[in-house]
Amino acid sequence: MKVLGIESSCDETGVAVYDTALSGVPALRAHAVYSQIALHAEYGGVVPELASRDHVRKLLPLIRQTLGEAGLRIDELDGVAYTAGPGLVGALLVGAGVARSLAWALDVPAIGVHHMEGHLLAPLMEDDPPQAPFVALLVSGGHTQLVSVKALGSYEVLGETLDDAAGEAFDKTAKMMGLPYPGGPQLAALAETGTPGRYKFARPMTDRPGLDFSFSGLKTQVLLAWRSSDQSDTTRADIARGFEDAVVETLAIKCLRALDAAGCNTLVVAGGVGANKRLRARLQEAAQRRGGRVCFPRPALCTDNGAMIAFAGALRLQAGEHADAAVHVTPRWDMACLPPLAAARESGVGNRE
């Protein structure tokens, strides 16, 4: 089954083709992503209306490009998957409308995919994929969640942020210190040059039981430190390092607690912040110490992309799911409400025998 995946939940237009006849890395026949960073930079954040209009402009050219790179004609597709939520409603509707139209014209099934399930399943596209049960850390600009995955499609949220997501905290902290948009990657790059330990910030909510997160207080702590400093380039880098260390250590502590709570030893990390080098190194170190395993998607598949939507959609289409002819999107959508992936269980994909 060759499935076209369309991602348009926010400010990246992603398209990919996943082929279930193959496995591992080669199964991803082609993928392309167009980022709207330059479009939104002058506003310091994503403008929903501009995001929607840009998806309209970029989606069809990206589909043509991706099919060309995959060496496929459009009539060779067996299904179309699209992000149905959560996300910006206008942006979601663009992708859903194009996907449903293509599916109708080609007389193939279409399926709406949960954006965060796409992220969660992305590491399964790599060689030697993780097997359920495992714990997933979903960490991005809009979400920070710890999820127990008993089987593919069977999700229990163990903890989540009570305010800012980790990626959002990165972006807002960077903006407070005068770094350009998008701030998160800029702050992480700057932290590489900072002096460890000069600024030591709190590890929020790690001094009490529970698996929820909170980053708003940390953000305020950094703001106060910045305002009272000499605001030199050196100090900016040192504060960035202190902030990143605090976030990384907080995530690591909570991940280890979640593994203990779930009674498993495999951790999956996905979402845009999952590309952070310091986070990857810290979690790999923690996994080795406990004799466990941590799995990441390749960095290009950490940020929003069509590949994860094509893959998640392919699994659900194989399970017999498909959308009706109407265009449905769900801007707010609880992943725990998703149905189990029966076909994936039967085939052994991502589940222990």
Swiss-Prot record:
The organism's place on the tree of life at top rank: Bacteria
InterPro entries in UniProt: ATPase_NBD, Gcp-like_dom, KAE1/TsaD, Peptidase_M22_CS, TsaD
Enzyme class: transferase
SUPFAM superfamilies: Actin-like ATPase domain
PANTHER family per the UniProt record, alphabetical: TRNA N6-ADENOSINE THREONYLCARBAMOYLTRANSFERASE, TRNA N6-ADENOSINE THREONYLCARBAMOYLTRANSFERASE, MITOCHONDRIAL
HAMAP family per the UniProt record, alphabetical: TsaD
Protein name (record): tRNA N6-adenosine threonylcarbamoyltransferase
Gene name tied to this protein: tsaD
